[in-house]
Amino acid sequence: IASCLVGSEMCIRDSMKKIGLVALFALLLAGCDDGGEKKAQENLRKAEAALEKENFNEAKLQIDSIRILYPKAFEARKQGVKLMQQVDLKEQQKSLIYLDSMMVVRQAQLDSVKGNFVLEKDTAYQEVGNYFYPTQTVEKNIGRSFLRGQVNEQGEMSLTSIYCAGGTLHHTAVKVSVGDTFAETPASKDSYETTDLGRAIEKADYKMGEDGGVIAFIVANKDKNIQLQFIGDRTYKTAMQPNDRKAIAELTELARILSGMEQIRKDKKEANLKIEFVTRKMQEQEEEK
Protein backbone atom coordinates (compact mmCIF):
# COMPACT_ATOMS: atom_id res chain seq x y z
CA ILE A 1 0.00 0.00 0.00
CA ALA A 2 2.85 2.35 0.89
CA SER A 3 4.45 1.83 -2.50
CA CYS A 4 1.16 2.66 -4.21
CA LEU A 5 0.82 5.86 -2.22
CA VAL A 6 4.37 6.89 -3.07
CA GLY A 7 3.68 6.23 -6.76
CA SER A 8 0.53 8.30 -6.61
CA GLU A 9 2.37 11.21 -5.04
CA MET A 10 4.99 11.06 -7.79
CA CYS A 11 2.26 11.03 -10.43
CA ILE A 12 0.61 14.03 -8.81
CA ARG A 13 3.91 15.92 -8.70
CA ASP A 14 4.56 15.11 -12.38
CA SER A 15 1.09 16.30 -13.31
CA MET A 16 1.53 19.52 -11.35
CA LYS A 17 4.82 20.17 -13.12
CA LYS A 18 3.18 19.67 -16.51
CA ILE A 19 0.31 21.97 -15.59
CA GLY A 20 2.78 24.55 -14.39
CA LEU A 21 4.77 24.34 -17.62
CA VAL A 22 1.61 24.70 -19.71
CA ALA A 23 0.52 27.71 -17.67
CA LEU A 24 3.97 29.28 -18.01
CA PHE A 25 3.96 28.68 -21.76
CA ALA A 26 0.51 30.27 -22.01
CA LEU A 27 1.71 33.31 -20.08
CA LEU A 28 4.73 33.62 -22.35
CA LEU A 29 2.48 33.45 -25.42
CA ALA A 30 0.18 36.05 -23.95
CA GLY A 31 3.14 38.32 -23.35
CA CYS A 32 4.37 37.87 -26.90
CA ASP A 33 0.93 38.19 -28.60
CA ASP A 34 0.47 41.75 -29.91
CA GLY A 35 -2.89 41.04 -31.50
CA GLY A 36 -1.21 40.89 -34.92
CA GLU A 37 -0.06 44.52 -34.77
CA LYS A 38 3.29 43.85 -36.45
CA LYS A 39 1.75 41.91 -39.31
CA ALA A 40 -1.04 44.46 -39.63
CA GLN A 41 1.53 47.25 -39.88
CA GLU A 42 2.97 45.47 -42.91
CA ASN A 43 -0.45 45.63 -44.56
CA LEU A 44 -0.58 49.34 -43.76
CA ARG A 45 2.78 49.88 -45.43
CA LYS A 46 1.56 48.04 -48.53
CA ALA A 47 -1.60 50.15 -48.53
CA GLU A 48 0.40 53.37 -48.30
CA ALA A 49 2.64 52.24 -51.18
CA ALA A 50 -0.42 51.43 -53.29
CA LEU A 51 -1.91 54.83 -52.51
CA GLU A 52 1.29 56.53 -53.67
CA LYS A 53 0.89 54.75 -57.01
CA GLU A 54 -2.84 55.67 -57.08
CA ASN A 55 -3.70 51.98 -57.03
CA PHE A 56 -6.81 52.62 -54.96
CA ASN A 57 -8.29 49.11 -55.17
CA GLU A 58 -5.08 47.53 -53.87
CA ALA A 59 -4.87 50.07 -51.06
CA LYS A 60 -8.45 49.31 -50.00
CA LEU A 61 -7.77 45.57 -50.17
CA GLN A 62 -4.77 45.85 -47.85
CA ILE A 63 -6.70 47.98 -45.35
CA ASP A 64 -9.69 45.64 -45.39
CA SER A 65 -7.33 42.69 -44.79
CA ILE A 66 -6.33 44.19 -41.43
CA ARG A 67 -9.92 44.19 -40.21
CA ILE A 68 -10.48 40.61 -41.38
CA LEU A 69 -7.14 38.98 -40.44
CA TYR A 70 -6.18 40.96 -37.36
CA PRO A 71 -9.37 42.01 -35.55
CA LYS A 72 -7.42 42.62 -32.31
CA ALA A 73 -4.81 44.87 -33.93
CA PHE A 74 -6.66 47.92 -32.65
CA GLU A 75 -3.93 50.49 -33.32
CA ALA A 76 -3.41 49.28 -36.88
CA ARG A 77 -7.16 49.25 -37.49
CA LYS A 78 -7.40 52.83 -36.20
CA GLN A 79 -4.63 53.90 -38.57
CA GLY A 80 -6.36 51.96 -41.33
CA VAL A 81 -9.54 54.00 -40.91
CA LYS A 82 -7.60 57.22 -41.38
CA LEU A 83 -5.70 55.83 -44.34
CA MET A 84 -8.95 54.66 -45.96
CA GLN A 85 -10.25 58.21 -45.74
CA GLN A 86 -7.18 59.44 -47.61
CA VAL A 87 -7.71 56.73 -50.23
CA ASP A 88 -11.37 57.71 -50.70
CA LEU A 89 -10.49 61.39 -50.90
CA LYS A 90 -7.75 60.99 -53.51
CA GLU A 91 -9.83 58.53 -55.52
CA GLN A 92 -12.73 60.98 -55.79
CA GLN A 93 -10.39 63.88 -56.59
CA LYS A 94 -8.86 61.87 -59.42
CA SER A 95 -12.35 60.90 -60.58
CA LEU A 96 -13.31 64.58 -60.82
CA ILE A 97 -10.29 65.33 -62.98
CA TYR A 98 -11.25 62.49 -65.32
CA LEU A 99 -14.91 63.55 -65.45
CA ASP A 100 -13.94 67.14 -66.25
CA SER A 101 -11.81 65.93 -69.16
CA MET A 102 -14.66 63.75 -70.44
CA MET A 103 -17.08 66.68 -70.25
CA VAL A 104 -14.74 68.71 -72.46
CA VAL A 105 -14.83 65.90 -75.03
CA ARG A 106 -18.60 65.57 -74.89
CA GLN A 107 -19.11 69.33 -75.12
CA ALA A 108 -16.95 69.44 -78.24
CA GLN A 109 -19.05 66.64 -79.75
CA LEU A 110 -22.24 68.53 -78.93
CA ASP A 111 -20.93 71.79 -80.37
CA SER A 112 -20.09 70.02 -83.63
CA VAL A 113 -23.62 68.69 -84.20
CA LYS A 114 -26.15 70.81 -82.30
CA GLY A 115 -26.40 73.25 -85.22
CA ASN A 116 -28.08 70.43 -87.16
CA PHE A 117 -31.10 70.53 -84.84
CA VAL A 118 -33.79 72.92 -83.67
CA LEU A 119 -34.13 73.47 -79.92
CA GLU A 120 -37.69 74.25 -78.88
CA LYS A 121 -38.00 75.60 -75.35
CA ASP A 122 -40.46 77.96 -73.74
CA THR A 123 -38.62 79.16 -70.66
CA ALA A 124 -41.90 80.39 -69.18
CA TYR A 125 -43.04 76.85 -68.44
CA GLN A 126 -40.28 74.49 -69.60
CA GLU A 127 -37.17 73.72 -67.58
CA VAL A 128 -35.95 71.24 -70.18
CA GLY A 129 -36.21 71.91 -73.91
CA ASN A 130 -36.47 69.44 -76.80
CA TYR A 131 -34.34 69.04 -79.92
CA PHE A 132 -36.02 68.27 -83.24
CA TYR A 133 -34.63 67.66 -86.70
CA PRO A 134 -35.45 70.70 -88.91
CA THR A 135 -37.50 68.68 -91.41
CA GLN A 136 -39.72 67.35 -88.61
CA THR A 137 -40.84 70.57 -86.93
CA VAL A 138 -44.59 71.00 -86.53
CA GLU A 139 -45.01 73.88 -88.97
CA LYS A 140 -43.38 71.87 -91.79
CA ASN A 141 -45.54 68.78 -91.30
CA ILE A 142 -49.14 69.94 -90.99
CA GLY A 143 -51.51 67.27 -92.28
CA ARG A 144 -48.82 64.58 -92.58
CA SER A 145 -48.84 61.15 -90.94
CA PHE A 146 -45.32 60.19 -89.88
CA LEU A 147 -43.00 59.13 -87.07
CA ARG A 148 -41.25 62.05 -85.38
CA GLY A 149 -38.19 61.87 -83.16
CA GLN A 150 -37.16 64.20 -80.38
CA VAL A 151 -34.45 64.40 -77.71
CA ASN A 152 -34.65 66.53 -74.60
CA GLU A 153 -31.68 68.44 -73.22
CA GLN A 154 -30.94 65.61 -70.78
CA GLY A 155 -30.51 63.13 -73.62
CA GLU A 156 -33.83 61.30 -73.25
CA MET A 157 -35.11 60.31 -76.68
CA SER A 158 -38.65 59.47 -77.70
CA LEU A 159 -40.76 58.93 -80.80
CA THR A 160 -44.19 60.34 -81.55
CA SER A 161 -46.43 58.66 -84.11
CA ILE A 162 -48.70 61.25 -85.70
CA TYR A 163 -51.72 60.10 -87.70
CA CYS A 164 -54.01 62.47 -89.61
CA ALA A 165 -54.78 60.65 -92.86
CA GLY A 166 -58.55 60.70 -92.48
CA GLY A 167 -60.94 58.94 -90.13
CA THR A 168 -59.89 57.52 -86.79
CA LEU A 169 -57.66 54.58 -85.92
CA HIS A 170 -57.42 55.10 -82.17
CA HIS A 171 -53.87 53.87 -82.69
CA THR A 172 -51.56 53.15 -79.75
CA ALA A 173 -48.65 51.39 -81.47
CA VAL A 174 -46.56 51.40 -84.63
CA LYS A 175 -44.64 48.78 -86.57
CA VAL A 176 -41.68 49.35 -88.88
CA SER A 177 -40.54 46.75 -91.35
CA VAL A 178 -38.14 45.99 -94.16
CA GLY A 179 -39.12 42.85 -96.01
CA ASP A 180 -39.68 40.11 -93.44
CA THR A 181 -37.85 41.90 -90.62
CA PHE A 182 -39.65 44.29 -88.33
CA ALA A 183 -39.90 45.94 -84.92
CA GLU A 184 -43.07 46.94 -83.12
CA THR A 185 -43.72 49.19 -80.15
CA PRO A 186 -45.75 48.02 -77.17
CA ALA A 187 -48.97 49.94 -76.55
CA SER A 188 -48.14 53.56 -75.81
CA LYS A 189 -48.53 54.79 -72.23
CA ASP A 190 -49.21 58.29 -73.55
CA SER A 191 -51.60 58.59 -76.50
CA TYR A 192 -54.09 61.34 -77.23
CA GLU A 193 -56.52 62.48 -79.89
CA THR A 194 -57.79 65.87 -81.03
CA THR A 195 -59.30 67.55 -84.08
CA ASP A 196 -58.21 70.47 -86.22
CA LEU A 197 -60.81 72.00 -88.54
CA GLY A 198 -62.75 68.76 -88.40
CA ARG A 199 -59.74 66.57 -89.16
CA ALA A 200 -58.91 63.91 -86.58
CA ILE A 201 -55.34 63.98 -85.29
CA GLU A 202 -53.90 61.13 -83.23
CA LYS A 203 -50.57 61.07 -81.43
CA ALA A 204 -48.80 58.43 -79.37
CA ASP A 205 -45.44 58.68 -77.61
CA TYR A 206 -42.81 55.96 -77.12
CA LYS A 207 -39.72 56.46 -74.97
CA MET A 208 -36.41 54.98 -76.02
CA GLY A 209 -36.04 51.72 -74.14
CA GLU A 210 -39.80 51.26 -74.15
CA ASP A 211 -40.15 51.38 -77.93
CA GLY A 212 -39.83 47.68 -78.74
CA GLY A 213 -36.56 48.29 -80.58
CA VAL A 214 -38.18 50.53 -83.21
CA ILE A 215 -35.55 53.28 -82.90
CA ALA A 216 -32.68 50.80 -83.22
CA PHE A 217 -34.39 49.17 -86.22
CA ILE A 218 -34.73 52.50 -88.02
CA VAL A 219 -31.08 53.39 -87.34
CA ALA A 220 -29.92 49.99 -88.62
CA ASN A 221 -32.04 50.36 -91.77
CA LYS A 222 -31.78 54.11 -92.34
CA ASP A 223 -30.63 53.63 -95.95
CA LYS A 224 -33.43 51.21 -96.82
CA ASN A 225 -37.10 51.64 -97.64
CA ILE A 226 -38.95 51.23 -94.35
CA GLN A 227 -42.68 50.66 -94.18
CA LEU A 228 -44.49 52.34 -91.27
CA GLN A 229 -47.73 50.87 -89.95
CA PHE A 230 -50.07 52.55 -87.45
CA ILE A 231 -51.86 49.96 -85.28
CA GLY A 232 -55.23 50.64 -83.67
CA ASP A 233 -58.82 49.53 -84.28
CA ARG A 234 -57.60 49.20 -87.84
CA THR A 235 -54.22 49.74 -89.46
CA TYR A 236 -52.76 52.35 -91.76
CA LYS A 237 -49.60 51.80 -93.80
CA THR A 238 -47.24 54.32 -95.35
CA ALA A 239 -43.58 54.54 -96.32
CA MET A 240 -41.12 56.40 -94.12
CA GLN A 241 -39.61 59.32 -95.99
CA PRO A 242 -35.79 59.41 -96.27
CA ASN A 243 -35.67 62.62 -94.19
CA ASP A 244 -37.60 60.93 -91.37
CA ARG A 245 -35.18 58.00 -91.32
CA LYS A 246 -32.25 60.40 -91.32
CA ALA A 247 -33.80 62.54 -88.58
CA ILE A 248 -34.26 59.62 -86.19
CA ALA A 249 -30.76 58.28 -86.88
CA GLU A 250 -29.12 61.65 -86.19
CA LEU A 251 -31.28 62.30 -83.13
CA THR A 252 -30.08 58.96 -81.75
CA GLU A 253 -26.49 60.18 -81.91
CA LEU A 254 -27.48 63.47 -80.27
CA ALA A 255 -29.19 61.50 -77.50
CA ARG A 256 -25.99 59.51 -76.92
CA ILE A 257 -23.95 62.70 -76.50
CA LEU A 258 -26.47 64.49 -74.28
CA SER A 259 -27.16 61.47 -72.07
CA GLY A 260 -23.40 61.01 -71.68
CA MET A 261 -23.09 64.61 -70.50
CA GLU A 262 -25.98 64.14 -68.08
CA GLN A 263 -24.33 61.05 -66.61
CA ILE A 264 -21.08 62.97 -66.15
CA ARG A 265 -22.97 65.67 -64.23
CA LYS A 266 -24.51 63.03 -61.96
CA ASP A 267 -21.13 61.35 -61.40
CA LYS A 268 -19.51 64.70 -60.56
CA LYS A 269 -22.25 65.50 -58.07
CA GLU A 270 -21.77 62.12 -56.41
CA ALA A 271 -17.98 62.55 -56.27
CA ASN A 272 -18.30 66.01 -54.72
CA LEU A 273 -20.72 64.69 -52.10
CA LYS A 274 -18.26 61.94 -51.18
CA ILE A 275 -15.39 64.43 -50.95
CA GLU A 276 -17.51 66.67 -48.73
CA PHE A 277 -18.42 63.73 -46.47
CA VAL A 278 -14.86 62.39 -46.12
CA THR A 279 -13.42 65.87 -45.55
CA ARG A 280 -15.97 66.52 -42.82
CA LYS A 281 -15.15 63.22 -41.08
CA MET A 282 -11.43 63.99 -41.21
CA GLN A 283 -12.01 67.43 -39.73
CA GLU A 284 -14.14 65.98 -36.93
CA GLN A 285 -11.39 63.53 -36.04
CA GLU A 286 -8.83 66.32 -35.91
CA GLU A 287 -11.05 68.33 -33.58
CA GLU A 288 -11.43 65.34 -31.24
CA LYS A 289 -7.67 65.13 -30.65
Feature roles, as predicted:
Residues M84-K114, Y125:
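Alpha-helical linker/edge segments of TPR/alpha-solenoid repeat scaffolds
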Residues L44-E52:
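Hydrophobic/aromatic side-chain positions at a characteristic register within alpha-helices
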Residues D33-K39:
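Bacterial lipoprotein signal-peptidase II cleavage site
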Residues L28-G31:
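C-terminal motif of bacterial Sec signal peptides marking the signal peptidase cleavage site
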Residues G36, K60-Q92:
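Short, charge-rich amphipathic alpha-helical segments embedded
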Residues I1-D14:
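Single conserved hydrophobic/aromatic residue that forms the stacking wall/gate
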Residues R199-D205, D223-K289:
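Internal interaction segment
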